[in-house]
Amino acid sequence: MKYNEGANLDPSQVGGGGGGGNGGKIAIGGGAGVVVLILALLLGINPGDVLGSGDQADPGTGQAPASPFAQCTRGSDIGKDRNCRFVAYTNSIQDYWGGTVQDYQVIKVQTFTGQISTACGTATSEVGPFYCSGDTAVYLDLGFFDELTTKLGAQGGDAAEAYVLAHEFGHHVQDLEGTLQRVQGGSGGTGPTSPGVRLELQADCYAGVWFNHATNDPQSPISEVTQADLDDALDAAAAVGDDRIQKKMQGQVNPETWTHGSAANRQKWLTTGFQSGDPASCDTFA
């Protein structure tokens, strides 16, 4: 991916300095158990519910007021501080959805270290990136991207990171559309055709739609997305497929326990979104 050095960035959309609190409600073991938890919850949407800690917590606990992204005001700042790329991803994704979804609500990406309290409960780094509908925010430990390559086997790269964030913003769009509420209020269950898997695949498709439009605006902070970038995004999508995860961690595949979809289906829906550029093509519930 290449960046538009002359583009304006809005650092207010990305916060940092959260985490490190001692009042966590989620206890997570170390070693392989941590990896399993990352894999099980990767790109999820409510860690409190999944981990059995649905009690609401004070979102302000452990968060520091200063943001490490405040200096990210121009595309050229990415060359000075690589962390500014997260502002570029976030701005571009929200610029697209803001012009596509009626009454779109701009939200914030909150980065943290260790653990953080949210309206969905207290989450730790091991949960992976997630969207919390309770406070309409995306939460991200930047160290997750090292886990994506070293433990999940993805190639990584900027486009892989952008895919992860675009997927989470896909959940925000689902929240605004009411899809998230319908799925969470339904019968639930797991498996390739379960509502939860369909929800995740739709978020993958929405990520692909954004990739299609990422460079359309001359003022976009992202100036180029190459085929190699798309390959990195597809590689990341496959790395978090349930079958790949189960094969790696358990040595066998059990489709009936899937929560996010197979590697092939995640790639399929990411590709569908990119090729169509149309959110209407992302009806994974049909």
Give, region by region, the residue ranges found by the protein language model.
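Post-HExxH zinc-binding segment in Zn-dependent metallohydrolases
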Residues: 1-15, 191-219
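Active-site recognition of the HExxH zinc-binding catalytic motif
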Residues: 38, 97, 140, 163-176, ...
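Short pre-active-site segment immediately N-terminal to the catalytic Zn-binding motif
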Residues: 146-163, 191-197
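Catalytic Zn2+-binding segment of zinc metalloproteases
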Residues: 169-184, 215
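Pan-zinc metallopeptidase signature
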Residues: 241-286
